[in-house]
UniProtKB/Swiss-Prot annotation:
One of the primary rRNA binding proteins, it binds directly to 16S rRNA where it nucleates assembly of the head domain of the 30S subunit. Is located at the subunit interface close to the decoding center, probably blocks exit of the E-site tRNA. This is Small ribosomal subunit protein uS7. One of its GO terms (biological process) is translation. Part of the 30S ribosomal subunit. Contacts proteins S9 and S11. SUPFAM superfamilies: Ribosomal protein S7 (SSF47973). GO terms for cellular component: small ribosomal subunit. Keywords: Ribonucleoprotein, Ribosomal protein, RNA-binding, rRNA-binding, tRNA-binding. The gene is rpsG. Belongs to the universal ribosomal protein uS7 family. It comes from Macrococcus caseolyticus (strain JCSC5402). Pfam families: Ribosomal_S7 (PF00177). GO terms for molecular function: rRNA binding; structural constituent of ribosome; tRNA binding.
Length: 156
């Protein structure tokens, strides 16, 4: 925690091709070692594959996929009287998009296809169809929150 008060939240600039801040955030999640050009190339090639395979606009499919991945509820550990409870809490809008993008990239990296472009494209298509690793992660998160609904009164 900085001594001079809270740190100002920096806003991302929209990407040059789709003019979308969400796409810029995804590029930042894909980027490794500051190689933005490589990350952009991967994403735009993946979008081309998505458009080719789905026959729809890649941005529409991507937004649908992200909406299917973003969690509404999650659990947070809360210590009460010597024992830890998994307390279900609602996820703030900013964190929802962050988690959605993070899960999309992480589960893309775990896939078996040869190139990252193919992995990302297939994960986006799967997420748009409510299947795939990232959507399963969201379902598991919601299941955990549902299972621990009894501890909801410990919310803070």
């Amino acid at each position: 925690m900085p001594r001079k008060g809270p740190v100002a939240k920096r806003d991302v600039l929209p990407d040059p091709i789709h003019n979308s801040k969400l796409v810029t955030k995804l590029i930042n999640k894909i980027m490794i070692d500051g190689k933005r050009g490589t990350a952009q190339k991967i994403l735009y090639n993946a979008f081309d594959l998505v458009q080719e395979r789905s026959g729809r606009d890649a941005m529409e499919v991507f937004e649908e996929a992200i909406n299917n991945i973003m969690p509404v509820l999650e659990v947070k550990a809360r210590r009460v009287g010597g024992s830890n409870y998994q307390v279900p809490v609602e996820v703030r809008a900013e964190r929802r998009t962050t988690l959605g993008l993070r899960w999309l990239v992480n589960y893309s990296r775990l896939r078996g296809e040869k190139t990252m472009e193919e992995r990302l494209a297939n994960e986006i298509l799967d997420a748009a169809n409510n299947t795939g690793g990232a959507v399963k992660k969201r379902e598991d998160t919601h299941k955990m929150a549902e299972a621990n609904k009894a501890f909801a009164h410990y919310r803070w």
